[in-house]
Amino acid sequence: MKKLTYLVAIAFTALPFAVRAQSADAIIDRAAAAYARLNSMRAEFRQTLTNTLTGTMQTTSGVILRRKPNLLSINFESGDRVAADGSTLWFYLPSSAPGQVIRMPYSGENASTVDPANQFLNSPRTRFTVSSAGTAALGGRATHAITLVPKHPNSAFTSAKVWIDDADSSIRQFDLETANGLKRHVVITSFTANPDLNKSSFRFSVPKGVKVVDQASGVTF
């Protein structure tokens, strides 16, 4: 009996370690599945960019809209905007590059990296080494954090820490760091799943007097 009790105790002692070892994969799998089920989404966010090389910091807020299969709009309070209208991706950044807008095809790597959630949740276990990074309450919601390290060189980031909501498996916060020393901290302050979004919300009209730089051809007009 004592031996049996001892073995049971050992089993229960080992169990939490096994659960912890599997939890990061389970969390990212749930998040990826929840993201794949979304037909549309709307999120408000607050972003802080820190450049460790220059010691500068910039904070801004904005709204991101997404509708399947290929519509995306990110509006910043600074007036900057990123928009994907179904075929073309537009980068209008008057705060840092006034007087111009960059356009490029919305496909391939362009499509996968511009959507913040997609860059983490598109085949995550194939692309990243995933590990647990603790728990936290964010805005009154329980979350689990995971760390993502690219298995292959990644121009978007060298490592990321992502907080996943325990209730709906949405992303509530993320930190990422790039090879050039840029740190990005994003907090999701509001999230709505499957809102009714009109296609006009994703349309981009070139402001008067702004030059268009076509990245594919290198032509400016």
Model segments located where?
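Bacterial N-terminal signal peptides that target proteins for export
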Residues: 1-8, 17
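N-terminal leader/targeting segments and the immediate start of mature chains
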Residues: 17-57, 67-71, 206-221
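Extracytoplasmic
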Residues: 38-40, 59-61, 69, 77, ...
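Short hydrophobic/aromatic-rich beta-strand segments that constitute the beta-sheet cores
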Residues: 45, 71-75, 89-92, 148, ...
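An acidic-aromatic
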Residues: 61-114, 184
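Flexible, surface-exposed loop/linker segments and immediately adjacent secondary-structure boundaries
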Residues: 98-142
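Gly/Pro-enriched, hydrophobic low-complexity segments
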Residues: 128-219
